[in-house]
Amino acid sequence: INMKLVIDVETNGFLDTLDKIHCMVFKDIETGKIYSYNPDQLDEGLKLLKKATLLIGHSILGFDIPALNKVFGKKFEYEGAILDTLLCSRLIWANRTDLDFQYKQLPPKLYGRHSIEAWGYRLGLRKGNFKEENTFDVWSQDMTDYCKRDVEVCYLLYKLIEAENYSKDAIKLEHQFAYWINKLEQGGVDFDE
């Protein structure tokens, strides 16, 4: 199977405190099919993730993959390729602030930002306001719908990244660098006394 999935997960906190994944949503970029997994279906979602040859996500290296590893441990071991749209966005559109003045719908506080929220405005697919109106303590269907919207925005961003035909070597190098920086952030650095 040559399955390429855009993914997003919603958790009950940031990496340092989270202990639960509430839901996962994936989109197969070849078929357009959406896969949605709520708390009682997460094992089924993990099986599909492991089959994918490419996982695409916004901050997938910095958050989603480490969150899956933290919560599921050995149950989640992914060996395929990863494309982080946040890293690609920062690399390809380093001058984002200069470009953002053309987007009348984009709130000025999002100028220059590479967040999925900012990209939602730019791509005409707003995220919604679940984050402002809710906590992430307990799963709800609204949370899964919010996760689906993030996946749709990420998919559109992925298509935009692909259309740029940016240097694959530069993207690969950026991902390798981010991988090691994330390892340092998570594990810390030892100092001689």
Question: Predicted regions span which residues?
Answer:
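Alpha-helical scaffold elements adjacent to nucleotide-binding pockets in ATP/GTP-utilizing enzyme cores
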Residues: 63-71, 115-119, 153-156
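Residues at alpha-helix termini
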Residues: 71-72, 123, 164, 187
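Mixed-charge, glycine-rich, non-catalytic linkers/tails in nucleic-acid processing enzymes
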Residues: 80, 88, 128, 133-193
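Metal-dependent DNA phosphodiester-chemistry modules and their immediately adjacent helices/loops
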Residues: 82-137, 145-152
